[in-house]
Amino acid sequence: MPIVTYGNYGFALLMVPTAAADYLEYERFKLIDELAPFIDSGKCKVFSVNSINTESWLNKQMEGSHKAIRQNQFNEYIYNEVVPFIKNATSWDTPIFITGASFGALHSMNLFLKRPDLINGAIAMSGVYDLTEYTDGYYDEQVYYNSPIHYIPNLTDHYVLEQIRRGKLIIATGQGSY
């Protein structure tokens, strides 16, 4: 999957696109231009990846179980390929923060909460955190573990909880249609 990089130094900011968008969405919508002072001054290095939403939760022809399987493949791609790519492009001690809006917020929140040992924080903007509305009533363990509204209240692993507490999490919401 394609990935785009902006900047040379600073903490790593991994951007996940909204709904059915791609890795260049934030450039097209001028968000990269707004971040330019931080990118150009070496405060952050931005990475943006493609989404798989049309191959999973937003694909109405796909069964719920297959949507969850595809989501897990995306999660593993981020953890096993994108995070090492970012670490190689920065340094192994450079913090990684992940952000997105809409479905990108879901991915950002989910990826951080599941692996706070790899991702240091998340900025989740106007996200949907309950995936059951995208599964036509299908619900299993895989849907549960990708739907933060369901699994977080039951999270009891003290090591993971402590890492989440040490991380940074910003949940931003708004009003209106978008």
Where are these regions (language model features)?
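Non-catalytic cap/lid and distal C-terminal segments of serine-dependent acyl enzymes
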Residues: M1-Y178
